[in-house]
């Protein structure tokens, strides 16, 4: 019988060299993300978001990236959820993209800020109607009696707002403003390639690149 200790893959699809990467980590991320799209990976926009609560307890969950530019990485959620409470207490977070089919991961760390109300409104209006209703119906992370309770809340919201629910005040966007971004490429014998971009100053547009030991 196969045991957990016996499960392993020898990575050999590609390499990652300083001479081949973009000087800007956002350009490098864009390059890798486009390659993930071209490879038709299932939901390459999924990422793990790690936060820390007021009690020091870490928490992680999968969320969807909804925007990337030179300012940072944007996602949307309920501000009153566990992640929202964590980020209110400690506005620092880490993101992880894992594209196993390409034997790649990207680790991103930095400070968190809320997006503007206009940016949140614009994205909320683009969501499917069911998702907009769900943002009102779900008290995310709260204990509920049953599935029937959730469905009753959904019906009540639908009857109240019809086809045009506004954005809830407790729902909107966050932007992770990175100070470090690591690109990881799997290599044979666990001697992986790891290139770390670090911002030269808090608001600097320039970055330094270092190679990390695997």
Curated annotation (Swiss-Prot):
Asked if the Swiss-Prot or TrEMBL record annotates the protein with the keyword Oxidoreductase, the reply is yes
GO MF terms here are: FMN binding; pyridoxamine phosphate oxidase activity
Question: Binding positions for FMN?
Answer: 61-66, 76-77, 82-83, 105, 140-141, 184, 194
Q: Which GO terms describe its biological process?
A: pyridoxine biosynthetic process
EC code(s) of this entry: 1.4.3.5
Which UniProt keywords are listed? Flavoprotein, FMN, Oxidoreductase, Pyridoxine biosynthesis
The record lists the catalysed reaction(s) as: pyridoxamine 5'-phosphate + O2 + H2O = pyridoxal 5'-phosphate + H2O2 + NH4(+); pyridoxine 5'-phosphate + O2 = pyridoxal 5'-phosphate + H2O2
Gene3D superfamilies, alphabetically?
A: Electron Transport, Fmn-binding Protein, Chain A
Q: Which residues bind substrate?
A: 8-11, 66, 123, 127, 131, 190-192
Q: In which pathway does it act?
A: Cofactor metabolism; pyridoxal 5'-phosphate salvage; pyridoxal 5'-phosphate from pyridoxamine 5'-phosphate: step 1/1; Cofactor metabolism; pyridoxal 5'-phosphate salvage; pyridoxal 5'-phosphate from pyridoxine 5'-phosphate: step 1/1
NCBIfam families assigned? pdxH, PRK05679.1
Binding partners and assembly: Homodimer.
Its biological purpose is as follows: Catalyzes the oxidation of either pyridoxine 5'-phosphate (PNP) or pyridoxamine 5'-phosphate (PMP) into pyridoxal 5'-phosphate (PLP).
**Protein's name according to its UniProt entry:** Pyridoxine/pyridoxamine 5'-phosphate oxidase
Name of the gene encoding the protein in the UniProt record: pdxH
